[in-house]
Structures are given as C-alpha cells and as structure tokens.
Amino acid sequence: MTTHNRPARVAEEFRHELSAILARGLKDPRITGFVTVTGSKMSPDLKEATVYVSIHGDERVRKDTFAGLQAAAGFLQREVSRALRLRNTPHLRFVYDESVARGDRIERLLREARTQGQAAPAPDVEPAPGAAPDDEAEE
C-alpha cells in the first residue's frame, strides 16, 4: 500500500472534521464571525496541520474571531485527533485565507462598474495618434 498520498487524505479528513466542530460552535465569545475552512495541508510526517480559514464579517469581527480560533487551537487539535483516531496529535496552525474576501471585493467592484456603465454613457474617446478612424478600419 502506498503512503505518499496519506498526508493529503489526512488533511482532507482533518478539514472535514474541523469544519463539523466549528459548525457546532465554540464557547469562546470572540468567535462571532462565520468561519469557513477553505483548505488544509498536512506535513509529510503528520505533525503539522495548516488550516486555511475564511471569516465573514467586518475587520474587527475577523480579527476577534481569528484570535478566538488561535486560542482554541489546542482544544480543536484534541477534538479532531480524537475523532480521527490519530496516533499523534498534529500541531494546528490557522492561516487567514483572503481569497474569498478578495473574490467578494472583485465581484462588488464589477457590479459597481456595470451599474455605473448603465447609468452614464461611455465618454467619447479619440483615436490614438496614428490610428485609423473607424470608417477606414472597416474597409
């Protein structure tokens, strides 16, 4: 049996179990934002687990929730290891995943651009120096 994919399999199981625990909720009052586990990586020796999280809410909610997650890391490590029946408990490290927030921002900017494009006519643009006028370009 090959074991070269084991870290990837354990990382996926780790992500799934951690998501379930977070869905049930933690008692830390700082964790008020909606937390999504977007990915996880496991070191080849299964001693380190890097978990990527996205937190929905304003900047303060994100910071407070992230601090709460880091404070709860030991508890979460034990709970996930117990559920997965791992021999060794991987050290859990959270990393804030900005890709979801970045995607939301891009989507909002595109929506605003479309709204502005419909509201205001496109400005007249003069051709660049040396460019052919439109009627000559069609010939």
UniProtKB/Swiss-Prot annotation:
GO terms (BP aspect): maturation of SSU-rRNA
Region feature Disordered, mapped onto this chain: 112-139
A GO molecular-function descriptor: ribosomal small subunit binding
Keywords: Cytoplasm, Ribosome biogenesis
CC terms in the record's Gene Ontology section: cytosol
Signal sequence bounds: none
Subcellular location(s) per record: Cytoplasm
Main subcellular location of this protein, as a coarse class: cytoplasm
Biased composition (Low complexity): 119-132
Gene3D superfamilies: 3.30.300.20
Subunit architecture: Monomer. Binds 30S ribosomal subunits, but not 50S ribosomal subunits or 70S ribosomes.
Main function: One of several proteins that assist in the late maturation steps of the functional core of the 30S ribosomal subunit. Associates with free 30S ribosomal subunits (but not with 30S subunits that are part of 70S ribosomes or polysomes). Required for efficient processing of 16S rRNA. May interact with the 5'-terminal helix region of 16S rRNA.
Family, as annotated: Belongs to the RbfA family.
Protein name: Ribosome-binding factor A
Species name: Anaeromyxobacter dehalogenans (strain 2CP-1 / ATCC BAA-258)
